[in-house]
Amino acid sequence: LVSSAHCKDGNCYDEALLDKLSNRLTGRNQFIVLHQNGSHGPAYDQRYPESMRVYNPVCNTNKLQDCSTQEVINAYDNTIRYTDYFLSKVIDWLTTRQSAYNTVMVYVSDHGESLGENNLYLHGMPYAIAPRNQKNVPFIFWASSGFYRDRDLNKECLVNLKNKEFNHDNIFHSFLGLLDIHTRHAKPERDIY
């Protein structure tokens, strides 16, 4: 199902998620989840195509402790750059469909990363002692004008939320609100929208 243009040596980049996605649209309301490789380490250099490599030199091994801190950071920053590019492709894809569908994209990472600070790498420390950079994650929202209109969302109000702190507990309840799903399990106070 994936194009070889987005794969190299058995490793597929996140863009492969968009290959043939249009063929899966049914014409009905759909909820699509794209689960990326994103910036998951330790093999950061395998998460983006060579064309996205702008920060050099990079760590080319999954043994991060064998690389300089700057090489690890450069490889990780290239993954962030590629994720930004990938999200722009998702938005482009959604934009071409907004005349037929109300489209929305929500991007959230499952965790942050340690890149060698205090000799810590990757993620997964117990929450109570995990450094902030393992707990802070991006949360990006984009929606078509039709979605804003039909859900009566106010862009200015959403922009004002950018400095508030939320956590993953908000995601489930926010999706219920966004998609106008009513259930006794919903907790409207956790819906950020």
Task: List each language-model region with its residue ranges.
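Catalytic domains that recognize anionic headgroups
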Residues: 1-193
